[in-house]
Amino acid sequence: VTTTGRVVVAGGCGAVGALLTVALRAAGREVLVVDPAADPTTPGMLRADLTAPDTALAGALGDAALVVLAVPDVIAGAALPVLARLLPPHTLLVETLSVKTPIAAALHTYRPGAPALGINPMFAPDLGLPGRPVLTVRHHDAPAADEFVTALRARGATVVETTADEHDRITAAVQVLTHAAILAFGIALDRLDVPGVAARVAAPPHTVLRALLARITGGTAEVYHDIQRTNPYADTARRALAEAVADLDAATDALPDFAALLDRAHTALGDGCPAAAELCAQLFATLPRDPGAVSSREERSRT
């Protein structure tokens, strides 16, 4: 980011905030991390409440050229009226919320015409930016927003630009639906109460689903809850999943019906089917021959 001036990263002690703080400092920017969990004895950190700023935070916001909102949607919504009062009109506001249509409307209300950019890293922050997809929404475009997007690309991110509505429709499929399907698999597995040896004899699809289940259930409940709760298309996505299971159940009565269901599912991949099949083959080739043994070694290492 070439624009000069102080950067304030609200929520900089969280995973996304920390990721962006590192990237901004690597680009030579002076970054102030603002977070209720910040260590006030550490340079460049301020312990403060964004929704009720003290004198120090109010001064920092008033001097900021860029403010990053790496906070939950509830806090971001409560902070917007405060930011509208304290931020200079030229300050670029970058929000990292997982749902964009509500914040887009709020920005139009509280900072109409002021520079604002939405970003959504579509990966766990511990994986790093290089080679990872980032969705962006230009709420109110400005040269500073161009520079921020260019900086993301310079750090190796694959930037995909969308509108706020397109963003939420995309994430309803790739996050809401995906997470719901994996969690439903885990709940069904628990209900079946299968013998523990199942993990050691499982075929690759089951092994991969177990790995995905471990990844999600080992994460932060608030993050996954926000995705399922706040996306305006979340109910539609979960309903589509439930209806698909009902369609599958009905199609098991006759082979032609089941074949038609397979064709319909295949159609959802579109032109990306060959690439997806190749990716699956590569993924399966990397799996251990005895995935249950991997679990056993991990369990022994924790004891």
Each predicted region: which residue ranges?
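Rossmann-fold dinucleotide-binding core
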Residues: 99-164, 168-171
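ADP-ribose/adenylate-binding Rossmann-like module
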Residues: 86-103
